[in-house]
Design a protein with these regions (language model features):
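Terminal amphipathic alpha-helical/low-complexity segments used for targeting or macromolecular assembly
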Residues: 1-77, 184-187
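Residue-level signal for functionally critical sites in structured catalytic/ligand-binding pockets
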Residues: 5-9, 18, 22-27, 40, ...
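A signal for specific C-terminal beta-sheet/loop modules enriched in small/flexible residues
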Residues: 7, 56-60, 67-70, 108-125, ...
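Generic serine detector
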Residues: 13, 21, 29, 33-35, ...
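Residue-identity detector for threonine
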Residues: 14, 79-80, 138, 177
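Left-handed beta-helix
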Residues: 77, 83-84, 88-95, 100-102, ...
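Conserved beta-strand-loop-alpha-helix hinge in the C-terminal portion
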Residues: 165-186
């Protein structure tokens, strides 16, 4: 109940970003609904999305944050994803047990299970739009990940990755360049 009240009381910018996240998550699950609240409820039933929702409300207005704190007292969060940083709308965390901590990330970031996006010292990654970080991949340090990038499962990224690249391995290396139609199929 408090989760929905927090959404209703949130500022318009927070609602817009949550809406982008909900759209992305429902599209991924092939669910279609016209009702904004019904769509939000569908997403809140998923543990993976609920963690993203709580992350978004951390930056909401005081009333929404207070409602989420009350919810946490009544029923503590089962959070298996740590999310920090400035991340634009369309965030999709495919499974739990991930750490998402870029300095900045663009729209439509998709993170697979067990992926880690973290800092090295005080240097945080900066991630572009339409990036997929697959299962158990690691992105660390002050690297810059371009737009339309796929980072393969188990890859370790410690150097910058240009736009429209597919990278794999440890250390990650570019194996091919992709076009938009390739990318849309995977995202």
């Amino acid at each position: 109940m408090f989760k929905l009240l927090a959404y209703i009381m949130a500022d318009e910018n927070t609602k817009r970003i949550i809406g982008e996240d909900v759209d992305r998550n429902l599209k991924w699950d092939h669910i279609n609904s016209d009702s904004r609240i019904k769509r939000l409820i569908l997403c809140l039933k998923k543990n993976d999305y609920r963690n993203v929702y709580y992350f978004r409300l951390k930056n909401a207005n005081k009333v929404a944050r207070a409602l989420i704190k009350i919810e946490n007292i009544i029923k503590p969060f089962d959070t298996t994803v740590e999310i920090v940083g400035n991340i634009k709308g369309g965030l999709l965390v495919s499974h739990c047990l991930s750490m998402v901590g870029p300095s900045e990330a663009g729209k439509n970031l998709r993170v697979g299970p067990g992926a880690v996006i973290g800092r090295m010292g005080m240097d945080f990654p900066v991630i572009g739009d339409n990036v997929y970080i697959a299962a158990n991949a690691t992105v660390i340090g002050g690297v810059h990940i371009g737009n339309n990038v796929i980072i393969g499962a188990g890859s370790v990224v410690v150097k910058d990755i240009p736009d429209n690249s597919v990278v794999v391995g440890n250390p990650a290396r570019i194996i091919r360049t992709i076009n938009e139609s390739d990318y849309n199929e995977i995202m």
